UniProtKB/Swiss-Prot annotation:
GO terms for cellular component: cytosol
Protein name: Uroporphyrinogen decarboxylase
Cellular compartments annotated: Cytoplasm
Domain of life: Bacteria
Pathway in which the depicted protein is active: Porphyrin-containing compound metabolism; protoporphyrin-IX biosynthesis; coproporphyrinogen-III from 5-aminolevulinate: step 4/4
Pfam families referenced in this protein's UniProt entry, alphabetically: URO-D
Keywords on record: Cytoplasm, Decarboxylase, Lyase, Porphyrin biosynthesis
Amino acid sequence: MIFVDACLKKPTPYTPVWMMRQAGRYLPEYMAVRERAGDFLSLCKDYKKASAVTIQPVEILGVDAAILFSDILVVPLEMGMGLRFEKGEGPVFDRPVKTAGDLAVLDVDRAVKNLSYVYDTIALTRENLARDKALIGFCGAPWTIATYMIEGGGTKTYAVCKKLLYTNPEFLHQILAKVTAALTDYVKAQIRAGVDAVQIFDSWAGALEESAYFEFGWRYILQIVDSVKTEFPDIPLIVFPKGVSGFLDKISGNFEVFGVDWSTPIGLAKEKLSPKFVLQGNMEPTRLYSKKAIDAGVDKILNTMKGAPHIFNLGHGILPDIPVENAKYFIKQVQEKSHNHK
């Protein structure tokens, strides 16, 4: 698998490429399956349909890896928090974590057991996915998951979570510890089900100042990494903390790949983190609106990363209104142009 080889810094004929949110609304084939499923969560829980949309981008676009179709919030959902997705509002938890009592009723073991539909999706996908294509599992990072659990949904200010951080840090650590335990077991279960690599998404890493991030964010990611590596030392792990370009000097850990978001100059990430880590990223997603912009973006990143271990990706998820033709063009350009760079 070219993707796994790249994660492990083995020689590859070209730079492997995939896209975050590649199984998504820009694909008519995805929308057809989602319509049959009824709603987003129902699609996540129907392992046959979830597997089908996981594989779609590989077959339609020719990406080098599939990423499991699911959502980072299925873990707190199955811990016992009522979750729904409101149109125009995003995810909403019926019972946010406000007190020690709220936290106490959340069940780690129940969550890992109840997520069997995810493991079934993985097993079916690995069975039907081409042998040379990697299957990437994923989870949210503890800090990002905790923000949703405490705020009760998405937030622009993180005010409730940050108030807790500065007024009752011990309780926030308790929440993070429980979430970390659930995520660690969940990642291990995904690996047992058949994923070839795992990505940890810390979407809200950039909401914290440096000292707070390394106390309440990064340390818990490393707990997951270290525990998983103890049991599965050969499975590549990818960490994607969005918005931490100012903290790159402090990044270390027992993982293989560091995901670079589009706001971080990849040359800076290369200077700070390569070749210790394989870098993944980081084209600005809106470049996909224009083939000319795609060409320029691909050339710039390939030239910057020439000679360094690299996996090509966007610097965030693909947007719902990107033309499929442009997405195909992007994948083809990366594969063809990087072949000439090797």
